[in-house]
Structure formats: C-alpha cells, structure tokens
C-alpha cells in the first residue's frame, strides 16, 4: 500500500442552534490527517513539489529541515516518511515530550533548542 502525505478527510454537516441562530455549517475533520492537523496538506505539498524539483534538476533527493512548536514538525516528518526522505525538526524546550516522541516515531531527527519557536527557528537558519 502506497503511503501518502495527506488523507481525504470527511466534511460533516452540523446544525447550530444557540438561541440566537439556527444555522447549518460544515466541519472538516483535519485531525484525521497523518500529522493530526491541516498542516499535513500544505507542508506535504511543499515537500513533494520541492523534491520533484530537486530530482528534475539532478540535485538528488531532498533532505528536509523544519522548525516547529509541534504540529508543523509532525506534518513534515510524516510527509518525509511517506516519500522516504530524511527529516530533521528543531523544536523549543517548551514542546511537550509527547509531541517530541510523535515526531521521532514518524522518523525525524529531533533537535531541542531555545525557549520558544523563534529561537528554534533562528538556530535552524544559522546552524
């Protein structure tokens, strides 16, 4: 079975009656994505397109580096796993251990640096 970097997720029609309005609206269940959020679509698309470009230019396979507080790193890791690409994610010290384990379980190398995402991102850009 071929892995993909995103899943087609259901769009569920819901009714809201809060005393002020009676409205129908739609909820997209993006939490069912491999990375658990909508970020799997955008980041996965960017990685796929960038890898195709690198291959067509003869640069070889892409290696992916991401800074993240959690969800973007997990999306990058799951996309890279589906495309057999190496991935490294820099997260700040404030990232929950559970998220670090998820990113690692998706196959990425995790580097913990900085007190917040900005410091993790700065480290990635200059290392």
From Swiss-Prot:
Taxonomy, superkingdom: Eukaryota
Pathway the protein takes part in: Carbohydrate biosynthesis; gluconeogenesis
Cofactor(s) required, per the database record: pyridoxal 5'-phosphate
Coiled-coil residue spans: none
Entry-annotated residues carrying N6-(pyridoxal phosphate)lysine: 39
Family (UniProt): Belongs to the serine/threonine dehydratase family.
Protein name, UniProt field: Putative truncated L-serine dehydratase YIL168W
The organism of origin for this protein: Saccharomyces cerevisiae (strain ATCC 204508 / S288c) (Baker's yeast)
């Amino acid at each position: 079975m071929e892995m993909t970097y995103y899943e087609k997720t259901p769009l569920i029609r819901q009714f809201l009656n809060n005393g002020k309005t009676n409205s129908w609206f739609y909820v997209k269940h993006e939490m069912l994505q491999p990375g658990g959020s909508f970020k799997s679509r955008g980041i996965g698309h960017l990685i796929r397109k960038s890898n195709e470009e690198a291959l067509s230019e003869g640069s070889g396979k892409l290696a992916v580096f991401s800074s993240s507080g959690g969800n973007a790193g997990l999306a990058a890791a799951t996309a890279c796993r589906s495309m057999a690409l190496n991935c490294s994610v820099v997260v700040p010290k404030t990232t929950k251990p559970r998220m670090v384990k998820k990113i690692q379980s998706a196959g990425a190398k995790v580097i913990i640096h900085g007190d917040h995402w900005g410091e993790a991102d700065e480290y990635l850009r200059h290392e």
